[in-house]
Swiss-Prot record:
Protein name in the entry: Lipoyl synthase
InterPro entries with a match to the protein in the record: Aldolase_TIM (IPR013785), Elp3/MiaA/NifB-like_rSAM (IPR006638), LIAS_N (IPR031691), Lipoyl_synth (IPR003698), rSAM (IPR007197)
GO MF: 4 iron, 4 sulfur cluster binding; lipoate synthase activity; metal ion binding
Lineage: Bacteria, Pseudomonadati, Pseudomonadota, Gammaproteobacteria, Lysobacterales
Disulfide links within the chain: none
Region (Disordered): 14-36, 346-373
Family membership noted in the UniProt record: Belongs to the radical SAM superfamily. Lipoyl synthase family.
Assigned keywords, A-Z: 4Fe-4S, Cytoplasm, Iron, Iron-sulfur, Metal-binding, S-adenosyl-L-methionine, Transferase
Database matches in PROSITE patterns: RADICAL_SAM
Family matches, as Pfam families: LIAS_N, Radical_SAM
CDD domains: Radical_SAM
Length: 373
């Protein structure tokens, strides 16, 4: 694989000189400048890179997006697609698929890449598992991804709420395959508690994203630990060898090819089965800047590198996100099911999936994004 040419753009982390503010009230959101401006990680100005043609996103016609949003509001549900301003939201919503975000809309972390609001979360909604299960059943979803904000305020990191959601979905929609995309459950005794709880009702796919290479963690994921995330993935797999494990990384934050390849090797060495690799897009001018746009050919080369390492599936492309076409990723990895939805749109083939990662459309959506957790 040819070593990519990386533009020499200095990234300076500057100290946070914001005065301490009064404690936040539960549920109050900090986003954009309000969120990042109070983070211990601040970024000096760097040149803004022009988005290449392969980063354009198609905005489909029709009212499927609005219909799905209405159903979500009716059941008081949140999708990470909306909260994180994902660039694929129009495509996924128009196909009747979504990644549901449980445990509220406020995260206890201030990751510099993420557009989800920071603050002091409200207590978990005990009715949310039932509302989620009802929506999944009404939509006729055959595959659903459930993720959450970080909940460092909870002793189990929210693991019991995940289990309650899994159990409720299986009760209301027993044919639905369930992938969970979890936080890291970091904290004294928290991983142990979370894994014990998840053992009572494990998902069909367990996903936890390492997000970036370890050298960039202080700037990208303050409050997280690379080895902790790897350990979580390995320990879950050891407890549930029959459940596929999955992780994902973003590119464009200043990583090198050698670092990316080393991270892929680390994931495989920790028994991760599937991996996603996609381009980081800056949600707001206050977030971590994009330092490089990797080309479609480079993503293809990383896909080949990952498959040679022994992953059962590698989704690698500029617009790939952890839960983007997650049903097809799982199907290609050997998890058998009929990946169709009830809203009338045909499932997208894996060939179409790969093609869409390299085709530029005439219109671009708001390309703020998160690879999410």
């Amino acid at each position: 694989m040819t070593q990519p040419i990386i533009r020499s753009i200095p990234l300076h982390v500057v100290s946070n000189d914001h005065p301490s503010s009064s404690p936040l009230q539960p549920g109050v959101k900090q986003s954009g400048e309000d969120k990042i401006g109070r983070s211990p990680v601040q970024f000096a100005d760097v040149p803004v890179l022009r988005k290449p043609s392969w980063i354009r996103v198609r905005i489909p016609s029709g009212n499927a997006v609005q219909s799905l949003k209405a159903k979500l509001r009716e059941n008081r549900l949140v999708t990470v697609c909306e909260e994180a301003a994902c660039p694929n939201i129009h495509e996924c919503f128009s196909h009747g698929t979504a990644t549901f975000m449980i445990l509220g809309e406020v995260c206890t972390r201030r990751c510099s890449f993420c557009d989800v609001a920071h603050g002091r979360p409200k207590p978990p909604d005990p009715e949310e598992p039932i509302s989620l299960a009802r929506t999944v059943a009404e939509m006729g979803l055959k595959y659903v991804v459930v993720t959450s904000v970080d909940r460092d305020d909870l002793r189990d990191g929210g693991a019991q709420h995940f289990v309650d959601c899994i159990a409720a979905i299986r009760q209301s929609a027993p044919q639905t395959r369930i992938e969970i995309l979890t936080p890291d459950f970091r904290g004294k005794g928290r991983m142990d508690r979370a894994l014990d709880i998840l053992a009572a009702c494990p998902p069909d796919v367990f996903n936890h994203n390492v997000e970036t290479v370890p050298a960039l963690y202080p700037n990208v994921r303050p409050g997280a630990d690379y080895q902790w995330s790897l350990t979580l993935l390995k320990r879950f797999k050891a407890q549930h060898p029959q459940v596929p494990t999955k992780s994902g990384i973003m590119l464009g934050l200043g990583e090198t090819l050698d670092q990316v390849q080393a991270t892929l090797r680390d994931l495989r060495a920790h028994d991760v089965d599937m991996v996603t690799v996609g381009q980081y897009l800056q949600p707001t001018p206050h977030h971590h800047p994009v330092l490089r746009y990797w080309t479609p050919d480079e993503y293809k080369a990383l896909e080949e590198y990952g498959m040679a390492l022994g992953f059962s599936h590698v989704a690698s492309g500029p617009m790939v996100r952890s839960s983007y076409h997650a049903d097809h990723q799982a199907k290609e990895a050997g998890l058998g099911f009929n990946a169709t939805v009830s809203l009338g749109s045909p499932a997208v083939s894996s060939t179409e999936h790969r093609e869409r990662n390299t085709i530029a459309s005439k219109s671009a959506s708001k390309t703020e994004s998160i690879h999410h957790r």
